[in-house]
A protein has these predicted regions:
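Bacterial N-terminal signal peptides that target proteins for export
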Residues: 1-7
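Bacterial signal peptide processing site
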Residues: 19-21
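Short, surface-exposed coil-to-beta transition loops
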Residues: 62-66, 91-96, 123-124, 164, ...
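C-terminal motif of bacterial Sec signal peptides marking the signal peptidase cleavage site
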Residues: 14-17
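Edge beta-strand at a domain terminus
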Residues: 125-132, 181-219
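N-terminal glycine/threonine-rich, aromatic-flanked beta-hairpin/loop signature
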Residues: 61-92
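An exposed acidic His-Trp-rich patch
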Residues: 100-158
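Tryptophan-anchored aromatic micro-motifs
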Residues: 27-59, 184
Length: 219
């Protein structure tokens, strides 16, 4: 009887502990929020980089100097101009990557568009193409399959090879340390309907900011 009583008394504190308030658990981090914060952490800074992929199509860009400039940042829009130095020493400032937060709740995502301008600031016939994220991605990498608006534009302009495009962007936060990188990649896969595989990838060293370039054309 004493043993039974002791066992019962011994379990009461444990049961009482189980019935007490449980510590709150933190909600899992949203990868897209973390990606956005990482990109925003470089706002105002410019970085050098270059081509790292090896498609023959891009051979003329293999040694080209390249810069990105995380130029403007707010809660729902970030612009990143992409500058390429030509063989004649002049800079092509026609390209700006535009990231936008879209949707809410389960429908939330990130949109990537490519703003292409002529030197006089007017829009190129092929501009504002891109796509929206199809999943949460990771804190470091987000992918953007081509959207229908862009497919229609590519078909209208005779760029049928581009209708299976997938763009991906990788970024490390400013505090990531010695190996922090930004990467932009375009891929096409024959298995997904492309006429041939395509891989274009540029990378930029985020550990060493350089002087910011002039504004991209049209801005």
């Amino acid at each position: 009887m004493r043993l039974t009583t002791a066992l019962l008394l011994g379990t009461l504190p444990a049961l009482a502990a189980c019935g007490g308030p449980q510590p709150e658990t933190e909600a899992p981090a949203n990868p897209q929020d973390e990606f956005w914060a990482a990109l925003s952490s470089h706002c105002g800074n410019a970085f050098e980089g270059g081509l790292v992929s090896e498609d023959e199509t891009d051979a003329d860009m293999a040694e080209a100097e390249m810069l990105i400039h995380v130029r403007t940042c707010d809660e729902d829009r970030i612009t990143v101009p992409f500058h390429i130095k030509g063989p004649d020493g002049t800079w092509n400032r026609s390209r700006t990557w535009v990231f936008t937060r879209i949707g809410e709740g389960d429908e939330a995502g990130i949109r990537l568009k490519h703003d292409h301008r002529h030197e006089d600031g007017t829009s190129d016939d092929v501009t504002m193409y891109g796509g929206d994220t199809a999943d949460q991605g990771t804190a470091r990498r987000q992918s953007f399959p081509v959207d229908q608006e862009s497919i229609d534009m590519f078909q209208r302009e005779g760029l049928d090879a581009s209708i299976t495009n997938v763009w991906s962007v990788e970024v490390d936060a400013a505090e990531a340390g010695d190996n922090a990188r930004y990467a932009y990649q375009l891929t096409r896969k024959q298995e997904l309907g492309a006429p041939e595989d395509r891989n274009f990838r540029v990378e930029f060293d985020l550990t060493n900011a350089v002087e910011a370039p002039p504004a991209p054309w049209g801005f």
